[in-house]
């Protein structure tokens, strides 16, 4: 367990580092061993560990990947941090409701623990968040108590490398009330035989608003979310990774668009991150019906859609 011995106990263990119940091979999407956490992991040491291990990773779609499901029970939201997140993303503040994207923030430290581990086959450095699909089955109270579960669902070949899918679930009791699938891409040399999701072809969406993004938006989002990836913080740290300036967090761009669009209480959200947004900068939020985009000139940075779940009351758009 290494650095995590103080915040982790595997189900079925004796509390002294025993093996998790049910450990062994498991197929994608099946139940693997569960590791129960007593608190959310700290992101900074995970980022450091993942960075140090990255040069030794040899990514491939056929690689083994961790089957463990990390579980954090008894989760309650820090309302001050939530308010800071709502302000930086443009959501209403002070309501007893979680923004549709906020459970991703809660689950991200658990995902990082998996992706920074020795048994995760892809290098954390250079791993690109390419898309997210979120399903919220009902409105989530900010004052509620939840159980959070995160696991790696599988690897897939991509013409530019290898993709990994990471699943996050939020439960109340036995019921899944929110879930997401995030895809991340590790770029490496391939035979270009891997698949890539086909994008829906449609004309440009009508512009709704022009947003001038300040140079500190990455630092403000990092303070609210805990995601302090250096590419988002300052031009000097971004240049170390090949960017001329700091870039906006992909999940900030998605959250900002969804705050502007609004979402039904029971909703399916899809967002694809297509190009980085350099900071400071000016972008156009465009939308038509269910679809939305964030554009800079002729370049689409983010595209996505908001879809009411069938069989649920679509009245009363919330964020």
Q: What residue spans do the PLM features occupy?
A:
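A broad, structure-centric signal for solvent-exposed, well-ordered loop/edge residues
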Residues: 141-143, 189-192, 220, 238-240, ...
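Well-ordered beta-strand positions in beta-sheet-rich domains
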Residues: 179-183, 210, 270, 303-306
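Generic structural detector for well-ordered beta-strands
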Residues: 133-135, 183-185, 210-213, 272
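Flexible glycine-rich active-site/ligand-binding loops centered on an Asp-His dyad
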Residues: 165-172, 176-192
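Hot-dog-fold acyl-thioester-processing enzymes
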Residues: 2-7, 12-14, 19-131, 191-264
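C-terminal domain-closing interface element
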Residues: 288-319
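Hydrophobic beta-sheet segments that form the core/acyl-binding groove
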Residues: 130-173, 266-300
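A broadly conserved detector of short glycine/acidic/proline-rich loop/turn motifs that flank catalytic sites
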Residues: 76, 217, 225, 275-277, ...
């Amino acid at each position: 367990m290494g650095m995590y011995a103080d915040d982790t106990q595997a189900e079925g263990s004796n509390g002294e580092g025993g093996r998790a119940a049910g450990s062994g091979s498991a197929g994608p999407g099946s139940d693997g061993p569960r590791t129960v956490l007593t608190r959310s992991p700290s992101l900074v040491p995970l980022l450091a560990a993942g960075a140090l291990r990255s040069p030794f990773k040899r990514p491939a779609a056929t690689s083994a990947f961790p089957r463990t499901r990390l579980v954090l029970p008894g989760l309650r939201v820090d309302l001050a941090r939530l308010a800071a997140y709502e302000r930086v993303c443009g959501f209403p503040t002070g309501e007893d409701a979680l923004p549709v994207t906020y459970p991703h923030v809660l689950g991200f430290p658990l995902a990082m623990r998996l992706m920074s581990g020795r048994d995760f086959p892809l290098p954390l450095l250079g791993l690109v968040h390419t898309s997210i699909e979120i399903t919220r089955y009902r409105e989530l109270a900010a004052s509620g108590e939840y159980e959070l579960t995160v696991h790696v669902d599988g690897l897939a070949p991509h013409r530019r490398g290898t993709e990994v899918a990471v699943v996050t679930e939020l439960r109340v009791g036995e019921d899944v009330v929110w879930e997401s699938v995030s895809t991340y891409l590790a770029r490496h040399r391939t035979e270009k035989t891997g698949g890539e999701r086909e994008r829906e072809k449609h004309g440009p969406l009508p512009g709704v608003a022009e947003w001038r993004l300040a140079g500190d938006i990455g630092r403000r989002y990092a303070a609210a979310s805990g995601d302090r990836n250096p590419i988002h913080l300052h031009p000097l740290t971004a240049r170390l990774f090949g960017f001329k300036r700091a870039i906006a967090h992909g999940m900030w761009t998605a959250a900002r668009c969804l705050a502007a669009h609004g979402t039904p209480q029971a909703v399916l959200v899809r967002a694809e991150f297509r190009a980085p947004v350099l900071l400071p900068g000016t972008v156009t939020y465009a939308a038509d019906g269910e679809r939305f985009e964030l554009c800079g000139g002729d370049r689409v940075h983010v595209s996505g859609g908001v879809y009411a779940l069938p069989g649920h009351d679509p009245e009363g758009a919330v964020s």
